[in-house]
């Protein structure tokens, strides 16, 4: 289940640049309560060691300050990332970070995913947005039976994913939930 993590040569440099941008914006706009983003960066990219996340097109729902999407986009430059964030100060920050980090594989959508034009993604990620089944519902039109979902969840997740055949990897207080909807039947 472990994959060797092979990050692009510029990854650490870009993370440092992101940290500076984040610190500057966070003082004014209160994007997040994180003071040190090191653990959040590691949490964001940990699934790359665990699951096969290869994708041509990926969506992150409720991107907030960019965890995990910015770091997955840095680590997966071959993937086109679509970040959906309806809160203006956060989507503005994400757009600024995209430009400053030179992330040409990333597009910021300043809207709720439910209101966006539909397209099919290979991978859909989300962290701390909503219950898993609610996330599946709001993403209708963006997935097919082959689309993989990667959901970052806290420690109590089993009831939330009942009825979903998923791989679950636990580390500390984090559960990484990975699944697709092939042969799942209707999820309620």
Swiss-Prot record:
It is found in: Cytoplasm. It holds the Pfam family GidB. The keyword S-adenosyl-L-methionine applies. It catalyses: guanosine(527) in 16S rRNA + S-adenosyl-L-methionine = N(7)-methylguanosine(527) in 16S rRNA + S-adenosyl-L-homocysteine. Transmembrane segments: none annotated. One of its GO terms (molecular function) is rRNA (guanine-N7-)-methyltransferase activity. Keywords: Cytoplasm, Methyltransferase, rRNA processing, S-adenosyl-L-methionine, Transferase. One of its GO terms (cellular component) is cytosol. S-adenosyl-L-methionine binds at residues 62, 67, 113-114, 127. Its EC number is 2.1.1.170. InterPro entries: rRNA_ssu_MeTfrase_G (IPR003682), SAM-dependent_MTases_sf (IPR029063). NCBIfam families: rsmG_gidB. Belongs to the methyltransferase superfamily. RNA methyltransferase RsmG family. Specifically methylates the N7 position of guanine in position 527 of 16S rRNA. This is Ribosomal RNA small subunit methyltransferase G. The lineage of its organism: Bacteria, Pseudomonadati, Campylobacterota, Epsilonproteobacteria, Campylobacterales.
């Amino acid at each position: 289940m472990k994959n060797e993590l092979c990050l692009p040569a510029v990854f650490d440099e870009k993370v440092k640049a992101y940290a500076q941008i984040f610190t500057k914006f966070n003082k004014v706009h209160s994007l997040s309560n994180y003071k040190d983003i090191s653990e959040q960066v590691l949490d964001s990219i940990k699934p790359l060691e665990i699951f096969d996340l290869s994708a041509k097109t990926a969506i992150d729902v409720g991107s907030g300050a960019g965890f995990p999407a910015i770091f997955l986009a840095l680590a997966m430059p071959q993937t086109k990332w679509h970040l959906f964030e309806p809160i203006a100060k956060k989507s503005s920050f994400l757009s600024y970070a995209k430009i400053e980090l030179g992330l040409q594989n990333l597009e910021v959508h300043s809207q709720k995913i439910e209101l966006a034009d539909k397209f099919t993604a290979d991978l859909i990620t989300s962290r701390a947005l909503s219950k898993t089944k609610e996330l599946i519902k709001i993403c209708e039109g963006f997935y097919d039976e082959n689309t993989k979902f990667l959901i970052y969840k806290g420690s109590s997740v089993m009831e939330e994913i009942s009825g979903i055949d998923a791989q679950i990897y636990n580390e500390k207080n984090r559960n990484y939930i990975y699944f697709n909807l092939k042969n799942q039947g209707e999820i309620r």
